[in-house]
């Protein structure tokens, strides 16, 4: 996990690749259990960037567990963020190949921190239609919420200080799986 710290001082390795896989299997089972009566209306939407491969991994788990193909989309929240401060943001674009109206949509992200990303994701998703329900799955919840948002599915709760950061690495985006805490 040498690359995950991005040159910063790594304070702790909190999830290995095997632990990430185990957490995602558990989250997948929890999603299936909670939505058992309406699995045909279930969809996953990964929040760019690392939420997308996590959503695909969860969909793969559900396929293996139940033989069910759950549609997966990618959501770019850039234009819905409240912290752009006049910047010229890079918009990568969303790709949601299904109607969200009437579906139970599980938004997937790597880290839940202040709640602002989740709020922006809900705004972006609601522009595409009115889901029956929106749920939130995160690999890591590090606390320090600024908005009244909580995840429905959490891989691991990691208490952190405001001076620390949580870095998630995934094979698909970073070449390796792992979660580290960096900073003071």
From Swiss-Prot:
Alphabetical list of SUPFAM superfamilies matching this protein: PRTase-like
Which Pfam families does the entry link to?
Pribosyltran
Q: Which CDD domains match?
A: PRTases_typeI (cd06223)
Motif PRPP-binding: where?
Answer: 105-117
Which keywords accompany this UniProt record? Answer: Glycosyltransferase, Transcription, Transcription regulation, Transferase
For this chain, the annotated S-S bridges are none
Q: What is its EC number?
A: 2.4.2.9
- Protein name, UniProt field: Bifunctional protein PyrR
The organism is Rubrobacter xylanophilus (strain DSM 9941 / JCM 11954 / NBRC 16129 / PRD-1)
- The gene for this chain is pyrR
